[in-house]
């Protein structure tokens, strides 16, 4: 019995969501369709940035560029942006989405804020 390779279907998606998770240590961007099925994703660690370089705005810009290039092969043109986390790569990633030719329909901050839940970690002293 011959083994046949299953061909991956090319999705044709015009509008989707971009989730930007910007932490103090890394930036992860996931591009989905409107139902939430992932089209592409990229992270600064996966693109070769190491250590403290992962959390820079340039790394976030590069991550956004890589994730959008993969998603544009599926025909993506308009996006809703959801930003989560306190990282410094937030603005540069959003700015890169516009320069890559995507039309940004909306931007929402979905950073989870506790209603006095867990005790926060100790403050940094530099």
Swiss-Prot record:
One of its GO terms (biological process) is translation. Located on the platform of the 30S subunit, it bridges several disparate RNA helices of the 16S rRNA. Forms part of the Shine-Dalgarno cleft in the 70S ribosome. This is Small ribosomal subunit protein uS11. Keywords: Ribonucleoprotein, Ribosomal protein, RNA-binding, rRNA-binding. GO terms for molecular function: rRNA binding; structural constituent of ribosome. The keyword Cytoplasm does not apply. Part of the 30S ribosomal subunit. Interacts with proteins S7 and S18. Binds to IF-3. InterPro entries: Ribosomal_uS11 (IPR001971), Ribosomal_uS11_bac-type (IPR019981), Ribosomal_uS11_sf (IPR036967). It comes from Treponema pallidum (strain Nichols). Belongs to the universal ribosomal protein uS11 family. One of its GO terms (cellular component) is ribosome.
């Amino acid at each position: 019995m011959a083994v046949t390779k299953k061909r991956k279907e090319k999705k044709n998606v015009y509008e989707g969501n971009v989730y930007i998770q910007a932490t103090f240590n890394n930036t992860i961007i996931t591009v989905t369709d409107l139902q939430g099925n992932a089209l592409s994703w990229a992270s600064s660690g996966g693109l070769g940035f190491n250590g403290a370089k992962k959390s820079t705005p340039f790394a976030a810009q590069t991550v956004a560029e890589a994730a959008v290039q993969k998603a544009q092969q599926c025909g993506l043109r308009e996006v809703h942006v959801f930003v989560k986390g306190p990282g410094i790569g937030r603005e540069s990633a959003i700015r890169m989405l516009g320069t890559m030719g995507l039309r940004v329909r909306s931007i929402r901050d979905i950073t989870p804020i506790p209603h006095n839940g867990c005790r926060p970690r100790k403050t940094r002293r530099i």
